[in-house]
């Protein structure tokens, strides 16, 4: 399964993650987030990670100009859109940045299947998260049974306060998810905790 650890903020965190058996690391570029990093910070931290780990920048309603600036100035290879981006915008993104993976976060609502169908031709991976009036993660869970209608043709990760106990619950539902996007539950006092990360990896992948 795919594991994405999101909200990396420091060199210490990046170095602790570098040897771990995970697939994606998220850097947040959104000033309203407590995990916000500027472009130079993202550049430095993204270059500490091996090529086998996707380096994802998380953005909210960005411009194409901002995305181009980040791509040119950092070592990221994936964009995660966490706002109200339109299909036309994503088409432009795909046209301009052919080698960049595009990830779209969507809220888990009764309309989730329709929402995914609108975007799926242009998106490499979806992240299904808890609905919120604010942009970004909430650390709260949602009704995972909403995802039972998503078949294997839809590549998606589950987010929203995911921890080891919730992973165990989700696995009993036999969903078609590819993995998990995790942030707050692998932190202690606001910093990524290596022991908590290893516990999640052991649960999801069965090996460290």
From Swiss-Prot:
Signal peptide: none
EC number of the protein: 5.3.1.24
Keywords of this entry: Amino-acid biosynthesis, Aromatic amino acid biosynthesis, Isomerase, Tryptophan biosynthesis
Protein's UniProt keywords contain Cell cycle: no
Pathways involved: Amino-acid biosynthesis; L-tryptophan biosynthesis; L-tryptophan from chorismate: step 3/5
Reaction(s) catalysed (UniProt annotation): N-(5-phospho-beta-D-ribosyl)anthranilate = 1-(2-carboxyphenylamino)-1-deoxy-D-ribulose 5-phosphate
Keyword Isomerase in record: yes
One GO MF term: phosphoribosylanthranilate isomerase activity
Domain of life: Bacteria
Pfam families found in the cross-reference section: PRAI
Family: Belongs to the TrpF family.
Protein name as annotated: N-(5'-phosphoribosyl)anthranilate isomerase
Gene that encodes it: trpF
């Amino acid at each position: 399964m795919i594991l994405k650890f999101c909200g990396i903020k420091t060199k210490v965190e990046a170095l602790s993650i570098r040897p771990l058996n995970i697939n994606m690391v998220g850097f947040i570029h959104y000033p309203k987030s407590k995990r916000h990093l500027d472009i130079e910070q993202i550049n430095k931290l993204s270059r500490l990670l091996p090529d086998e780990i996707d380096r994802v920048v998380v953005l909210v309603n960005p411009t194409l100009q901002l995305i181009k600036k980040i791509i040119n100035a950092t070592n990221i290879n994936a964009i995660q859109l966490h706002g109200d981006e339109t299909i036309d915008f994503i088409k432009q993104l795909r046209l301009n940045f052919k080698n960049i993976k595009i990830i779209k976060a969507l809220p888990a609502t009764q309309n989730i299947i329709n929402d995914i169908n609108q975007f799926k031709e242009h998106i490499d991976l979806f992240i299904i998260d808890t609905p919120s009036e604010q942009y970004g993660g909430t650390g709260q869970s949602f009704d995972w049974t909403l995802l039972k209608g998503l078949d294997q043709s839809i590549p998606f990760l589950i987010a929203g306060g995911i921890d080891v106990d919730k992973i165990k619950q989700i696995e009993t539902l036999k969903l078609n998810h590819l993995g998990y996007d995790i942030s707050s539950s692998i932190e202690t006092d606001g910093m990524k905790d290596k022991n908590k990360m290893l516990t999640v990896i052991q649960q999801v992948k069965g090996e460290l």
